[in-house]
């Protein structure tokens, strides 16, 4: 599992079309925008397990305290690895990550298996960008 954390002034995304046949149907393809979120670009890799979510949650808690965002955006992002988990496994781990994060934070979860356009306006402070790899 790999994550890229970006503290954004503004982040917007809009689903455009399915990237996977098995992608869930969406009730809306409207653009979603958040001001001052901590955006988590997350890649699920082969062999990743739910235990890794605990490590991710720990890092989210720490980063949340450091940068004081208004909430979180969890954004499935396959481009951080070339060792991707099968889509069904990735979708399930991302679902669990969204669920777990939602227990502690206000979170928006971008859809898995969709092409999405996005707008990212990042803060420029020293803690605005952070990458993590979870073994």
Functional labels for PLM-detected ranges:
Residues 1-14, 25, 33, 37, ...:
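Non-catalytic terminal extensions that flank enzyme cores
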Residues 9-67:
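Conserved mixed alpha/beta catalytic, RNA-binding, or beta-rich assembly cores of soluble enzyme
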Residues 10-12, 78-80, 111-116:
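Active-site-proximal loop/turn and secondary-structure-junction residues that shape catalytic pockets
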Residues 58, 62, 89-99:
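Alpha-helical scaffolding segments of alpha/beta enzyme cores, especially the outer helices
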Residues 68-84:
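Short glycine-rich, basic-tinged beta-strand/loop micro-motifs
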Residues 82-91, 121-125:
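Short glycine/threonine-rich loop-to-helix capping motif typified by GTGT followed
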Residues 94-135:
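Divalent-metal-activated hydrolytic enzyme cores
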